[in-house]
């Protein structure tokens, strides 16, 4: 009986660490953290992935109620959250780009309630949905889980992990929030700016025409038309953002 209890305690102490890292990743990654993936599904997925990775390596037995155990809890949460945050940058870039497009079209007040992001413009929500479909089409969910499981070999549990290079990489990659949003929105914003300038010139030349009465619906229609015409290039840019995110995730793990 005592031998059985000792084996159960040892199993708990070894399974705890990979499960903490996997759970932290699932809570912060863009696809697995959405409201459609319920807490039960996330817990079940975390347990399943933990059992998958358990036979692949020799796990250290660390008591979580010691100083070393508390440090290890912090490190596993840090690694899981960091890997999820690297992917979350892509969705943040899409929201920034969607907000810029909505403001140019005059739809900045047309918001939707997103359970993960709060109030976001409808254009941004549309881009996030497209991004999720592209992510699944690229097989990103499989690649991300593979990288997560590989992280246990590259960033082993029980060893000291240098946090500074990982934080610097995250800060460097977070610049893509604004750069990626600008790459997505700039063609449409430039076209709408030219239309706005044209309307302003017409209004200045003939004030009696009252161009602003039709200017607002015209800007919305032009914005929708430009968005539809730009969807192929936007799709390629979203695909490029995901591919860059996978590369950065590999750099964080030391693969690239």
Language-model features: where?
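Hydrophobic alpha-helical segments and their helix-loop boundaries in membrane
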Residues: 1-256
């Amino acid at each position: 009986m005592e031998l059985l209890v000792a084996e159960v305690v040892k199993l708990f102490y070894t399974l705890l660490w990979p499960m903490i890292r996997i759970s932290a990743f699932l809570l912060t990654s863009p696809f697995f953290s959405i409201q459609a993936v319920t807490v039960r599904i996330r817990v079940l997925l975390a347990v399943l992935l933990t059992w998958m990775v358990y036979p692949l390596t020799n796990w250290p037995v660390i008591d979580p109620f010691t100083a070393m155990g508390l440090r290890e809890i912090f490190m596993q949460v840090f690694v899981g959250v960091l890997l999820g945050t690297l992917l979350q940058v892509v969705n943040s870039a899409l929201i920034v780009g969607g907000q810029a497009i909505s403001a140019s079209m005059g739809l900045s007040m047309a918001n939707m309630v997103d359970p993960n992001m709060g109030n976001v413009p409808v254009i941004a929500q549309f881009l996030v949905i497209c991004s999720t479909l592209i992510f699944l089409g690229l097989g990103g969910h499989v690649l991300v889980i593979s990288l997560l499981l590989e992280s246990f070999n590259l960033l082993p549990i029980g060893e000291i992990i240098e946090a500074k290079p990982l934080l610097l990489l995250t800060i460097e990659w977070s610049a893509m929030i604004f750069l990626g949003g600008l790459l997505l929105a700039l063609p449409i914003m430039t076209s709408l700016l030219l239309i706005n300038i044209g309307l302003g010139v017409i209004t200045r030349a003939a004030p009696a025409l009252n161009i602003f009465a039709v200017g607002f619906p015209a800007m919305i229609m032009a914005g929708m038309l430009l968005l539809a015409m730009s969807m192929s290039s936007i799709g390629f840019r979203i695909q490029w953002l995901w591919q860059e995110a996978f590369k950065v995730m590999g750099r964080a793990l030391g693969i690239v």
